[in-house]
């Protein structure tokens, strides 16, 4: 997404839902930062994965589910902020009956 700054962004307007897999949208990217949007239909999951040298912050915008982190399952609802440090396996599962929308911020940018 090409933006002029300052530009207000309404993440939900850029959500890309897919019936077959988690939807992903990039809202902003520079050499230092990536701001993305993950969109989950009920039952969808972003399997455990890790990022070498990148910290990741998730902010739940809508819906509910589970944050998977090092063998733990942490409940998440709208307004929850979660951190996945570099090299730590993490994932997300939509366990709710509605769509789950999660802002994902990675630094530095991949």
Regions found by a protein language model. Name each.
Residues 33, 42, 53-54, 72, ...:
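A generic "binding-loop/recognition-motif" signal
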Residues 72-86:
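Short acidic-glycine-tyrosine-enriched beta hairpin
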Residues 1-36, 47:
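A short, N-terminal "cap"/entry segment at the start of jelly-roll beta-barrel domains
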Residues 86-110:
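Ligand-binding loop in jelly-roll beta-barrel domains
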Residues 31-33, 41-45, 64, 108-110:
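Short, charged/polar surface micro-motifs in flexible loops or helix N-caps
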Residues 34, 66-68, 91, 101:
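General beta-strand recognition
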Residues 39-41, 50-67, 105:
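Short, conserved beta-strand element in jelly-roll/cupin
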């Amino acid at each position: 997404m090409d933006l002029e700054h300052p530009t207000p962004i309404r993440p939900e307007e850029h959500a890309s839902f897919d019936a077959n897999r988690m939807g992903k949208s990039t809202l902003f990217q520079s050499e230092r930062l990536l701001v993305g949007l993950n969109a989950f239909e009920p039952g969808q999951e972003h399997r455990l994965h890790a990022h070498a040298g990148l910290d990741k912050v998730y902010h739940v915008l809508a819906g509910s589910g589970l944050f998977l982190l090092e063998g733990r399952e942490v409940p998440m609802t709208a307004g929850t902020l979660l951190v996945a440090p570099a090299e730590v396996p993490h994932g997300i599962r939509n366990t709710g009956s509605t769509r789950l929308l999660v802002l994902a911020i990675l630094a530095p940018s991949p």
